[in-house]
A protein has these predicted regions:
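PLP-dependent amino-acid enzyme catalytic core
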Residues: 1-171
Length: 171
């Protein structure tokens, strides 16, 4: 284990830089979503959901909490392989690089900010660039299949409480 004085984006940049060194990559791999091999098992979740839900004859829409956008990228890969997914909704916290991009068309990564949903504290999600590539960098095509919204800590707390109050489910 190694402690880094920084945020997720700082750590991710260190790992990406290390992987540029061919000597290091002979002995090092990554288990996080910058390694596309991680997407393969994640894709099965989307196929399994389809298997369970397709008999309802409704459009399939996935809402995925997103930080580095690896899980939702696996879903987009499943869609590109033919899974009939109508739309993806990526929720983020105040680290709103992707929601802002979908609003203004300018991809402008930021330094990540700490939130209560710390697994989503990513200001420059490396897998979103891959999603853009899967849509041939066509913003209009992306927006036809993909939406993203950001939520503050207060909004997150309110929804968690609402879900618990209405269903007894702890989020």
């Amino acid at each position: 284990a190694l402690e880094v004085d920084g945020v997720f984006d700082d750590c991710q940049e260190m790992v990406k830089t290390a992987f540029l060194d061919e000597e290091i990559t002979k002995k090092l791999t990554s288990a996080n979503s910058i390694n596309v091999a991680r997407w393969l098992p994640q894709m099965f979740y989307f196929f399994f959901a389809y298997k369970e839900l397709h008999k309802q004859h409704k459009d399939l829409v996935f809402s995925v909490p997103s930080g580095n956008f690896g899980n939702i990228c696996a879903g987009v890969m499943a869609q590109k392989l033919g899974l009939p997914i109508k739309h993806f909704v990526a929720s983020t916290n105040i680290n709103d690089t992707v929601p802002n991009y979908l609003i203004n068309g300018i991809y402008s990564p930021k330094t990540s900010k700490a939130t209560i949903s710390n697994a989503m504290d990513v200001g420059n999600p490396s897998n979103f660039i891959r999603i853009q590539e899967l849509f041939n960098n066509d913003l209009k095509a992306l927006k036809n299949s993909f939406s993203s919204y950001s939520f503050s800590d207060d909004e997150t707390r309110e929804k968690m409480q609402e879900i618990y109050n209405t269903s007894g489910y702890v989020t």
